[in-house]
Structures are given as C-alpha cells and as structure tokens.
C-alpha cells in the first residue's frame, strides 16, 4: 500500500483516508482533511503563512 502526502500540510495519508481532488487539467491533489481541502481549493491560502500547518517554514 502506498502512503501519500497531503498537498497542503504535508501529513501522511493512509490508504482509504483523505480527499482526492482532480483539477480540470488532470492534476491530482490529495488532502488529509476537509480543513486542508477548503484552505487550499476554496480560499487559496498559502500553507507557509498558517501556524497550524506542519510543513510551515520557520
């Protein structure tokens, strides 16, 4: 089984979990939670500027 990384926060996503979003150009984005999905797709937020994101650069 393959473990994927969240496209927004970088967390590990186990098989059977998370949200898979396919853009109109065919790009596949995988998210660990609805919070990450909405932040990235709906609001277009930058993960580096949010305190709760794990892959935030300090």
From Swiss-Prot:
Cofactor: Zn(2+)
Zinc finger (C4-type): 6-36
Native source organism of the sequence: Pyrobaculum aerophilum (strain ATCC 51768 / DSM 7523 / JCM 9630 / CIP 104966 / NBRC 100827 / IM2)
SMART domains according to UniProt: TRASH
Molecular functions (GO terms): rRNA binding; structural constituent of ribosome; zinc ion binding
Family to which the UniProt record says this protein belongs: Belongs to the eukaryotic ribosomal protein eL24 family.
GO cellular component: ribonucleoprotein complex; ribosome
NCBIfam families in the cross-refs: PRK14891.1-1 (NF034186)
Gene3D superfamilies: Ribosomal protein L24e
A Pfam family that the UniProt record links to this protein: Ribosomal_L24e
Domain of life: Archaea
Sites where the protein binds Zn(2+): 6, 9, 32, 36
HAMAP family: Ribosomal_eL24
Family matches, as PROSITE patterns: RIBOSOMAL_L24E
Protein known as: Large ribosomal subunit protein eL24
Keyword rRNA-binding part of the UniProt annotation: yes
Record's keyword terms, sorted: Metal-binding, Ribonucleoprotein, Ribosomal protein, RNA-binding, rRNA-binding, Zinc, Zinc-finger
Function as written in the Swiss-Prot or TrEMBL entry: Binds to the 23S rRNA.
UniProt GO BP: translation
Subunit-structure text: Part of the 50S ribosomal subunit. Forms a cluster with proteins L3 and L14.
